[in-house]
From Swiss-Prot:
GO biological process: proton motive force-driven plasma membrane ATP synthesis
Organism: Haloferax volcanii (strain ATCC 29605 / DSM 3757 / JCM 8879 / NBRC 14742 / NCIMB 2012 / VKM B-1768 / DS2) (Halobacterium volcanii)
Compartments (UniProt record): Cell membrane
SUPFAM superfamilies: C-terminal domain of alpha and beta subunits of F1 ATP synthase (SSF47917), N-terminal domain of alpha and beta subunits of F1 ATP synthase (SSF50615), P-loop containing nucleoside triphosphate hydrolases (SSF52540)
Enzyme class at the top of the EC tree: translocase
Name recorded for this polypeptide: A-type ATP synthase subunit A
Encoding gene, per UniProt annotation: atpA
Domain of life of the native organism: Archaea
Amino acid sequence: MSQATQDSVREDGVIASVSGPVVTARGLDARMNDVVYVGDEGLMGEVIEIEGDLTTIQVYEETSGVGPGEPVESTGEPLTVDLGPGMMDAIYDGVQRPLDVLESKMDSAFLDRGVDAPGIDLDEKWEFEPTVSEGDEVAPGDVVGTVPETVTIEHKVMVPPDFGGGEVVAVEEGEFSVTEAVVELDSGEEITMHQEWPVRQARPAAEKKTPREPLVSGQRILDGLFPIAKGGTAAIPGPFGSGKTVTQHQLAKWADADIVVYVGCGERGNEMTEVIEDFPELDDPKTGNPLMARTCLIANTSNMPVAARESCIYTGITIAEYYRDMGYDVALMADSTSRWAEAMREISSRLEEMPGEEGYPAYLAARLSEFYERAGYFTTVNGEEGSVSVIGAVSPPGGDFSEPVTQNTLRIVKTFWALDADLAERRHFPAINWNESYSLYQEQLDPWFVENVEDDWAEERQWAVDVLDEENELQEIVQLVGKDALPEDQQLTLEIARYLREAYLQQNAFHPTDTYCSPEKTYGILTAIHAFNDEAFKALEAGVPVEEIQAIEAAPRLNRIGVQEDWEAYIEDLKAEITEQLRELY
C-alpha cells in the first residue's frame, strides 16, 4: 500500500489511552481519515475523530501490549489502495496487504503485527502496449495503453482522474515495472501503470445510467424470478446455515461479470479457503479460462482485528470501480455486511457515541447507503460503459429480518433474495423464499430476455409466479382439512406447483451440470412444466381423475431436466411423452 512506505511521516504524537482497537493520541499533526502508525511496532491505523489536542485512531491490528507514552506518526495521507496490474488472482487482507507476500516475509501462517507490503508488486515487469502516439491529446480517464494482466483480463492503463491531461510528448513500449513512466505529457506529468486512490472516495464517472442488462447468475430462481441488473444492488439476508455463503460462491463462480471482487468480511476462514481451493479448478463458462484469472479476493476473516473489517468493504468497492473505469462489468460480493456493521457498532461504542437501534450507530443507514450507491451502470470519464453490481449478504441474528442492518439494507437495494431456514431444513436449496423475495429490475430487464431468450419470457415467468402464489394460499386450507378435501383442479395446481419447486426452483450447486443453468435452459424447464400443466388440465376437463394424471410415468422426469447436458432434446422428448400418456387417458 502507498501508505505503507512510511517515508512521508510527519509530526509525532504520543498515545494518551488505549481501548481495544481505539487509541487516543495527544499532540498529533493529522487530518481526518489520515493513516497513522501507532506504537513502537508501527501498527497501522486511521484517524476517525479530532477534538482539540486529542486525536482518536482506529487501529487495523491487534493493540494488546500497546500503552500510553508510545509514539504515533502520521503519514499525512488518507487510506488509499494501490491500483495497477497484478490485482487479479491476488488475495488481500482488509487494508490491501497481499497475504501471500506477508507469508513469505514471515515464514509463518500467522500474521505478525506491524508487517506491511505494497498492494501490487512494484518491481514486477509488465508488457506495455501503447494506444496513444506523440502529439495526441489525452484527458483524465483516457486509456493510454494496455497490459495483458491475466489470460482473461486486458488491463487498460489510464490517465489518473486527478491528473490535468494534455498533449503526449513521449511514449514508451516494452517491459516496465508499474512505477516507471510509460507516457509523458507536455505539462511535465508522467503516467505510470500505478495509481493510488482514497478508499472512502468514489471514483468519478461521466454519467450514471439505468441498467438494461441482467447479471446472469446461472441460478434458475434468480435469473427466472428475481433477476439483478448489471450495475444493480442485491441483498441476501438469512439465518445461519440457510446458504448465504454458498449462494455468494455460486454467484462469484458463474455470474457473467468480467471481473469478480469477493470480500469475505468477518466470516469464517474456512469459507475463504474453500474459494481459494475451488476457483483455480473451475473454468469461466464465458471464456473457458480459470475463474481465478478474473477474481480478486479480500479476506478479512472473523479472527482478524475488528477495525479492519470496516475498511475491507471500501477496499473492495474501490478496486471494483477501478476496473469499471476500464469498461468492465464488475460484480462485488460482500459476505457479510452484518459483520461490517458490527465492527462499526464496536468502534462507535468505544467512542462513547449515542447509540441508535440495537446499539448500532445512528449513521448506520448513511454508511450502508454510501456503500451501495457506489454500485451502478456508468458511462466512464473516457466514454466507455462499465458497471459495478453489489451483492451483500446480511446475517441477522436468529434470522430476524426486522433488525436494523436488514431493514436499512432493504431500503437501499432493489433486489431482495430472502433465505429461509425452513426451506434449508427441508433440504430445498437454494433456500430462497419465493413468497418474500422480489426484484425491482424485472420490467427494465424483460426486453433483454425477450430479445435474447424468448418472446414470451415475461408471460412464462408470470404464470410460474401465479401458480406459486395460488399454492401458498391453498397450503393454509390443506393444513386444516387435508389435500384430499380440495376440488380436483386445486389438487392438480398443487401438483404443478410441486414440480415448479422441485424441478425449477431447486438446484444442486454441487452437481457438475446442474450447478450452472443458462437462461435458455431456465426457460426450457419452465415451458416443459407449463406444457404438462396445459395437458393435465385438458385431461381433467375430459373427466380423467386427478390420481391418474399424477400417476403418469413421464411426469417425474421433469425433475431430471436440470442434470441433463443435452437438455433441449430431452425436453422435446419429454413434452411428447407427457402429451401422449395423458391423451391415452381420455
